[in-house]
């Protein structure tokens, strides 16, 4: 929102109620102003469902060729593959693995290749794809998921188990991969979160061991406590993404070790009230981070002053803050 990006949401083979839920959500947050919805529900003919993503691509290309920036979300490619399999079997084409036709990989790879970033002399527009695929009982080695993984610049894997534990968004950091990663991150985020993924994965392994082995030393307890705080910091409430500049401030406090003495409840409270407190004490800091996108000496100095203010005003006290 407010970034000059046109969004296209393409729904394939899902129910009318699922479509209405998405439309209601987009309308509630004012996203319909910059979003085009291309929908072919399960009640529509198979041919229409098959053509829906191609229609979304063509609409996106129209705006890309005019110099615009487009994000296309496909919900989802699993159902599109099912529809193509159904049509192919009706046409008596030879079935292959899992009864899919032999050109199922070509079908999706050809579509993915339409995403591009054009040169300035060719309008300078861009189109980014965000395809969604369902997994069967969390198996990412299925035919369609592995096909898509081989085509894209990475994947975000959402785990049912993590969702049940209350970790939302339920992103499995072990199975989620980015092939471009830090190249597209803000330098500030890259500097502060470089080791965060490894630290979190080590915490998850340590937590599993701690469940089996009750005895643990002081160092183990310290690492577990720090891991729980990391887990709390990377959680987000539903439909409430945390702006990157707020993440920079939050992880700066964490990297300076200022959150280590906090209990889990106090860490939650600190995270929930941080943005409001920063705007009150340092109204220009978030704007400066958003514009510079890097931890300049001036921004670090302001962040250090903010830490001092936090200490003086009791934000970091374990039993209640200002």
Place the predicted regions along the sequence by residue.
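Short, ordered loop/turn segments at secondary-structure junctions
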Residues: 11-15, 40-44, 76-78, 135, ...
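Phosphate-binding glycine-rich loops and their immediate beta-loop-alpha structural context
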Residues: 1-41, 45-53
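Well-ordered alpha-helical segments embedded in enzymatic catalytic cores
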Residues: 18-21, 52-55, 59, 107-111
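Phosphate-binding/switch loop-helix module in NTP-utilizing enzymes
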Residues: 48-84
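Conserved helix-loop functional segments at active or binding sites
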Residues: 21-29, 58-65, 86, 113-117
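Loop/turn-to-beta-strand initiation segments
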Residues: 4-6, 33-36, 67-71, 124-129
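Conserved catalytic/coupling modules of large nucleotide/cofactor-utilizing molecular machines
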Residues: 62, 79, 89-322
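Short acidic, glycine/serine/threonine-rich loops at helix termini
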Residues: 19-24, 48-52, 82-88, 140-145
């Amino acid at each position: 929102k407010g970034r000059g990006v046109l969004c296209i949401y393409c729904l394939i083979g899902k129910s009318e109620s699922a479509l209405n839920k998405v439309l209601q959500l987009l309308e509630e947050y004012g996203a319909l102003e910059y979003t085009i919805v291309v929908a072919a529900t399960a009640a529509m003919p198979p041919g229409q469902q098959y053509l829906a993503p191609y229609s979304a691509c063509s609409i996106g290309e129209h705006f890309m060729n005019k110099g615009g920036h487009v994000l296309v979300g496909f919900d989802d490619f699993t159902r599109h593959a099912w529809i193509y399999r159904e049509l192919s079997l009706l046409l008596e084409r030879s079935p292959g693995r899992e009864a899919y036709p032999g050109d199922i990989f070509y079908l999706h790879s050809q579509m993915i290749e339409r995403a591009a970033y054009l040169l300035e002399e060719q309008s300078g527009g861009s189109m980014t794809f965000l395809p969604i695929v369902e997994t069967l009982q969390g198996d990412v080695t299925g035919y369609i998921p592995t096909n898509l993984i081989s085509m894209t610049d990475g994947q975000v894997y959402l785990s049912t188990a993590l969702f049940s534990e209350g970790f939302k968004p339920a992103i499995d950091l072990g199975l989620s991969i980015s092939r471009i990663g830090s190249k597209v991150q803000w330098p500030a985020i890259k500097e502060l979160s470089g080791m965060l993924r490894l630290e979190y994965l080590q915490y998850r392994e340590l937590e599993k061991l701690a469940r089996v082995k009750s005895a643990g030393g002081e160092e183990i307890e310290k690492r577990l406590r720090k891991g729980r705080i990391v887990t709390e910091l990377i959680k987000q409430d539903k439909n409430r993404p945390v702006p990157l500049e707020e993440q920079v401030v939050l992880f700066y406090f964490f990297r300076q070790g200022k959150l280590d003495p906090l209990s889990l409840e106090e860490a939650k409270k600190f995270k929930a009230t941080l943005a409001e407190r920063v705007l009150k004490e340092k109204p220009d800091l978030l704007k400066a981070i958003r514009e510079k996108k890097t931890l300049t000496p001036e921004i670090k100095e302001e962040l250090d002053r903010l830490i001092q203010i936090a200490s003086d005003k009791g934000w970091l006290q374990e039993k209640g803050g200002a």
